[in-house]
Amino acid sequence: MDPTKFKEVLSGFSVTTVTPFSDDLSQIDVDAIELNIDFLTKNNVPLIIPNGNTGEFYSLSEKEWTVVLQTMIEAASNKATIMTGVGHSIKTAITQLEISRGLNIPAVMILYPQHVFISKEGLLEYYRTLLEAAKDLNVVLYKKGPLLTDMMLEKLLTYDNFVGVKYAFGRIVDFSRTISKLGHRVVWSCGTAERFAPFFFLAGAKGFTSGLCNFAPHVSRRMFDALKTSNFEEAMKVQEMITPFEDLREGRGGANNVPVVKAAMDHMGLKGGSCRPPIHQLTDEDRQAIIDIISKW
């Protein structure tokens, strides 16, 4: 997919998918992935993002990463665009890029490195190496930390395959300042979902990623349709409706993020299941709170 076409897809809403496991957490539940993706494609979700933070990227082996991606591609059956998360070491990420290219997906998202010792200079070299290795793959960078600065982004804009940024760090004023400096040579996507999408769109975002889209794509579409037509009154109605759910996801210092989405999926007849450690299991009280909230949607 050429960059212009993919930018059009990125300028919409997308789902960051969960990874369902077997009951003992030892295996990827392939059948569950197929069921979940069938639900998403039947609801016309345009862009599916496996192997991200919501997909417990850092809890997957390299083989499992491939299984998740391949299963989702086959399940989507060209009914949605797939963009996978890549990362870890440079060597691992390059292998993931090669696998992605071999599976004919159009784009990848480079996750923000989780490294104990990291510097701006080192991070810049990390991105440059992967952008060069990506070749004809469209690349989205995930801003999830302070070292991916405006200056660094500007230096990386020289790469034609750098097409977008999932922005999920800092204040809205920082995001606004970034767009003022760098313009719209890439697509800016709100990486903090429906809750903050109205504010990011006012500042210049064109799309947003969503976790709740895993089980409530109609809510994501309602938000996007409102934002696309600048109906901010409607957008804020959706924002107010989903805020209690997002508050639950922020519990335990944000550690509730994925298990809350998975529990909601289970309640809706989809396959979420449990998370692998170091993510925790929810209490019965947490699960009831989720049901109480989403039953009003």
Each model region followed by its residue ranges:
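C-terminal alpha-helical cap/extension of soluble enzyme domains
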Residues: D2-P3, V9-P20, N43, I105, ...
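Short glycine-rich loop/turn motifs that provide flexible caps or phosphate-binding loops at active sites
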Residues: S11, N51-T54, T84-V86, V163, ...
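Conserved active-site and cofactor/substrate-binding residues in soluble primary-metabolism enzymes
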Residues: I28, L35, K63, V67, ...
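Glycine-rich phosphate-binding "P-loop"
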Residues: L111-Q114, N161-F162, R276
